Amino acid sequence: MARKTPIERYRNIGISAHIDAGKTTTTERILFYTGVNHKIGEVHDGAATMDWMEQEQERGITITSAATTCFWKGMEMSFPEHRFNIIDTPGHVDFTIEVERSMRVLDGACMVYCAVGGVQPQSETVWRQATKYKVPRLAFVNKMDRQGANFFKVVEQMKLRLKANPVPIVIPIGAEENFVGVVDLVRMKAIYWDEASQGMKFDYREIPGELQATAEEWREKMLEAAAEASEELMNEYLENGDLSHEKIVAGLRQRTIACEIQPMLCGTAFKNKGVQRMLDAVIELLPSPVDIPPVAGIDDYEKPVERRADDSEKFAALAFKLMTDPFVGQLTFVRVYSGVLKSGETVLNSVKGKKERIGRILQMHANERQEIKEVLAGDIAACVGLKEVTTGETLCDPSAPIILERMVFPEPVIHVAVEPKTKADQEKMGIALGRLAAEDPSFRVRTDEESGQTIISGMGELHLEILVDRMKREFNVEATVGAPQVAYREAIRKPVEQEGKFVKQSGGRGQFGHVWIKLEPNETGKGYEFIDAIKGGVVPREYIPAVDKGLQETLPNGVLAGFPVVDVKVTLFDGSYHDVDSNENAFKMAASMAFKDAMRKASPVLLEPMMAVVVETPEDYMGNVMGDLSGRRGIVQGMDDLPGGMKEVKAEVPLAEMFGYATQLRSLTQGRATYSMEFKHYSEAPKSVAEAVINNRK
């Protein structure tokens, strides 16, 4: 099958934003203008096309990144047809993982900001993720028709809070209820959209007199940004004081793709103004799969290899998301980086070393699907029939193995125990939790060995609430949920040397393992590190992996209260063996005993998860909010003024103190304050807290 759309005309983009910046509405409008949706879905009615899980429609927030394909030829139909693969990403901080995994497979992103709220805490998180994956960005300032809308304030906030380099390519005509259109700084024309046609029709007019000077000032800034792309452009700009339309676009495009600038647009998606110009900017300024460096990975021999975005290359794709579909079962969303994948073919999961057969291939439009025979380089599609794949693994041509860089998922910080209500629910719950954990790598399931309870862990209360809710709706499992528990950790403060000896003499063959280890604190975040410093074979080579294994098996249960031990370095430096009685198991036991004894002597401490909390509150309630945060052992790290007499408080608070905060904040501020929180780091718990936690576990 020949390509319908050349790869240069592909745009794989994400629409990303803070909750309530109007992201889903913006995506809806994109689908409307590109002709996919005939009736615009409104989030207010719970009818948006991209928010297709029931919980999303009820809560009016987007949880899963739905992937959609649509086509655009430009506002004036002046471009050849471009193919957009759009990933809608959630804005709630508990679903940061969803944003992270979509950033990994995007070539560009549109950041949507609210013209009133501006750059909010979640926007900063998303911005960091986009920077981490070097994703070129455009910014769209939405809700220009709202009370308090201020485009230029958002430009300043982007510089201050995100350390961004925003370059407006349009400026608004009017604001709040007087917002009527935009001045296009590239064409130096005013654009007015026709409300009766839901923004399908528009016309160019002269720039209103009172805006002429402002428009010229901002055009000057845009020209400078474009001219900095190359010496040639800079010289032309300095000589002529201007650049042609084509050269402005070329200069801005080059610098946007290099992540040096972020072109800015504005509008109101709800009132059908401005989104159309943003779509043109996606074509003009964001990269196609061939404009970005080839994707890098390693082959079977751990040698670096690259794959270009080309159909003639060997097939390589990244599975970036799993979803359970009520009709076809498990869907695996893949981003194809190189080559072609046909339905019915066998591919290699290079991470697990297993081959799998691709059943059907579906192109998704939110939750509607169209079956296709093959998927080409640069595309995003969903495969049916893959059983072993989990998020972040590579699928490739079995004749040319490659492992693409994996995604790193955060460790969960909150646990709850779940118990099925009936015996019949027991088995169904196991299947349901297994499916949900395969879909979402930041969600873990385990069985507590002592109590036999099933423990689920995630990134926040809302995260777990929604997963329990999905268990009920999608799998018909009724479960009772316990109170949330904090994921504490244990660490040590001083180095110690310790002997471990496991000797068992009984008739016949005995057991003998003997080691000396040095246990010392490791850098924060480094985790466990094992160093083999054995000289002269005092512990034979073949037993050293057993020592490492014995140590690793002891890590999940610390000596203070049985919490996992983190950030330790263990050096095996001496020991002895017995020709007949030594075996792997004996050395494993000796290492485990040495570790436990060493840990007790190494000043063990309890670590608790600290959360970065951002509260937005009316000034009148500032005292209550601050007092409450200090009462929760919070450390206030900064305050900012926000528009409309609001204040922003940033604090670091232990997770243990944050349960039920939403309800408390509501009553403190009569429901007028909002907050967001995300995991920051682990830090040593105060003595009184540690003692209470340890006594509780006994």
Swiss-Prot record:
GO terms for cellular component: cytoplasm. It is found in: Cytoplasm. Residues 8-290 form the tr-type G domain. InterPro entries: EFG_II, EFG_III, EFG_III/V, EFG_IV, EFG_V, EFG_V-like, EFTu-like_2, G_TR_CS. Its main location: cytoplasm. GTP binds at residues 17-24, 88-92, 142-145. CDD domains: EF-G (cd01886), EFG_III (cd16262), EFG_mtEFG1_IV (cd01434), EFG_mtEFG_C (cd03713), EFG_mtEFG_II (cd04088). SUPFAM superfamilies: EF-G C-terminal domain-like, P-loop containing nucleoside triphosphate hydrolases, Ribosomal protein S5 domain 2-like, Translation proteins. GO terms for molecular function: GTP binding; GTPase activity; guanosine tetraphosphate binding; translation elongation factor activity. Keywords: Cytoplasm, Elongation factor, GTP-binding, Nucleotide-binding, Protein biosynthesis. GO terms for biological process: ribosome disassembly. Catalyzes the GTP-dependent ribosomal translocation step during translation elongation. During this step, the ribosome changes from the pre-translocational (PRE) to the post-translocational (POST) state as the newly formed A-site-bound peptidyl-tRNA and P-site-bound deacylated tRNA move to the P and E sites, respectively. Catalyzes the coordinated movement of the two tRNA molecules, the mRNA and conformational changes in the ribosome. Belongs to the TRAFAC class translation factor GTPase superfamily. Classic translation factor GTPase family. EF-G/EF-2 subfamily. This is Elongation factor G. It comes from Aromatoleum aromaticum (strain DSM 19018 / LMG 30748 / EbN1). The gene is fusA.
